[in-house]
Swiss-Prot record:
GO terms for biological process: isopentenyl diphosphate biosynthetic process, methylerythritol 4-phosphate pathway; terpenoid biosynthetic process. Keywords: 4Fe-4S, Iron, Iron-sulfur, Isoprene biosynthesis, Metal-binding, Oxidoreductase. Belongs to the IspG family. [4Fe-4S] cluster binds at residues 304, 307, 350, 357. Binds 1 [4Fe-4S] cluster. It comes from Sinorhizobium fredii (strain NBRC 101917 / NGR234). PANTHER family: 4-HYDROXY-3-METHYLBUT-2-EN-1-YL DIPHOSPHATE SYNTHASE, 4-HYDROXY-3-METHYLBUT-2-EN-1-YL DIPHOSPHATE SYNTHASE (FERREDOXIN), CHLOROPLASTIC. Pathway: Isoprenoid biosynthesis; isopentenyl diphosphate biosynthesis via DXP pathway; isopentenyl diphosphate from 1-deoxy-D-xylulose 5-phosphate: step 5/6. GO terms for molecular function: 4 iron, 4 sulfur cluster binding; 4-hydroxy-3-methylbut-2-en-1-yl diphosphate synthase activity (ferredoxin); 4-hydroxy-3-methylbut-2-enyl-diphosphate synthase activity (flavodoxin); iron ion binding. This is 4-hydroxy-3-methylbut-2-en-1-yl diphosphate synthase (flavodoxin). Its cofactor is [4Fe-4S] cluster. NCBIfam families: ispG_gcpE (TIGR00612), PRK00366.1 (NF001540). The lineage of its organism: Bacteria, Pseudomonadati, Pseudomonadota, Alphaproteobacteria, Hyphomicrobiales. The keyword Cell wall biogenesis/degradation does not apply.
Length: 417
């Protein structure tokens, strides 16, 4: 039965597929998760360690800064070290100002990178702009590499902005400065892509991005870009900020765009706290795609938020422990238990929603709330399987989860089939 309130994501916008070192971006491929290092690329040990950590966390592409000769010289060594570690992760070179020179002077770097990222706003200035842009495109053609043309409103092409502002001022019904800025961002990306194609770079070697730091601006700019091209699109909110603010801003903007079918690869740009874990941005990107139903990366642990009926912290501690165990175990589980990403575990704190939510999970437990009988029913595949009692309920449930995973996704399943 259909309803006026039935709601599903819009079909993915049709885009040209781009092969980035064996990872397909666009076309019918799933939305790709990527990240960026914050190490000095010339520090090979630190960069290899961070790329490895990001890739292990689930980043399918990793971008590194290539800003000087020492960084460019380090790239092939970084690539070689990663391959020795068994990590064939595509590396994206982030170029600004002198990318044309670095690629020409360091052919091993140009070969080792899986993609070049260039910014039309600072690839060159005045009469040098088109020449230096062309030199990078020629290198991409020579080495058969894709290019992301990444416009950023913090380094916008000032000549184009000035021209559009002047044209707008002369118009009968001028747009606001914000609207002209948005149009400039879109035109900068599209004109650069057009020039790249004129220079001979195939359409299936071009990805576009148009990053701003305001949620509404980002949604507007990408909607405009999506309507006016079929290039694969890289989504990201630049300067999103730290902590909760950065997560909320990125999730709100990227979530809306992906719900509209826009976006082929995403990066969650979080400002890490001093000494913070860089892999957090990968985790947030995966969780965003998973909660929206676009991809499955890790088993889901559903847990109630707690209320006056759940003064005990047992259910919170158990939910946290299971979540941590899952995240820690996933690198092994992906190989050992194919399909385990689809697992849903429920850890509930009282009788109100506990049994119902647990029945909807693959395996769930409803712990006793305040004043309730000290017993915890366990539900497996929608049916009540047992009731746990005593001081070791949490430990016993963890063993049940491990046993369920082994039987459903391990060799036991294969033998049964």
């Amino acid at each position: 039965m259909s309803s006026a309130f039935d709601f599903e994501p819009m079909p993915r916008r049709a885009s040209v597929a781009v092969d980035v070192g064996g990872v397909i971006v666009g076309g019918a491929a799933p939305v790709v998760v990527q990240s960026m290092t914050n190490t000095d690329t010339a520090d090979i040990d630190a960069t290899v360690a961070q790329v490895a950590a990001l890739h292990k966390a689930g980043s399918e592409l990793v971008r590194i800064t290539v800003d000087r000769d020492e960084s460019a010289a380090a790239v092939p060594k970084i690539r070689e070290r990663l391959l020795r570690l068994g990590m064939d992760v595509p590396l994206v070179g982030d170029f600004h100002y002198i990318g044309h020179k670095l690629l020409a002077d360091h052919p091993a770097c140009a070969e080792a990178l899986a993609k070049y990222r260039i910014n039309p706003g600072n690839v060159g200035f005045k009469d040098k702009k088109d020449k230096q842009f062309a030199e990078i495109i020629e290198m991409a053609i020579r080495y058969d590499k894709p290019v992301r043309i990444g416009v950023n409103w913090g380094s916008l092409d000032q000549e184009l902005l000035t021209r559009l502002m002047d044209e707008n001022q002369a118009a009968g019904s001028p747009l606001t400065a914000q609207q002209v800025t948005r149009e400039t961002i879109v035109q900068s990306a599209l004109l650069s892509a057009e020039l790249a194609e004129e220079l001979g770079l195939p359409r299936n070697r071009i990805i576009l991005s148009a990053k701003v730091s305001g949620v509404q601006d980002l949604i507007a700019v990408y909607a405009m870009l999506a309507a006016r091209s079929d290039h694969a699109l890289h989504l990201g909110l630049t300067e999103a900020g730290m902590g909760t603010k950065g997560i909320v801003a990125s999730s709100a903007s990227l979530g809306i765009l992906m719900q509209q079918g826009i976006g082929d690869t995403i990066r969650i740009s979080l400002t890490p706290e001093p000494g913070g874990d860089r892999t957090r941005e990968v985790q947030v990107a995966q969780e965003l795609l998973q909660v929206m139903g676009f991809r499955q990366f890790i088993p889901v642990v559903a847990a109630c938020p707690g209320c006056g009926r759940t003064t005990s912290t047992v259910f919170q501690e158990l939910a946290q422990k299971i979540q941590e165990d899952i995240r820690t175990s996933m690198p092994v589980w992906r190989e050992k238990y194919p399909g385990v990403e689809a697992l849903k575990v429920a850890v509930m704190g009282c009788i109100v929603n506990g049994p119902g939510e647990s029945k909807h999970a693959d395996i769930g437990i409803s712990l006793p709330g305040t004043g309730e009988t000290p017993a915890a029913p366990v539900f497996i595949d929608g049916q009540k399987a047992m009731t746990l009692r005593g001081p070791k309920i949490a430990e016993e449930f963890q063993l049940l989860v491990a046993d369920y995973i082994e039987k459903r996704f391990g060799h036991g399943q294969a033998a049964a089939e």
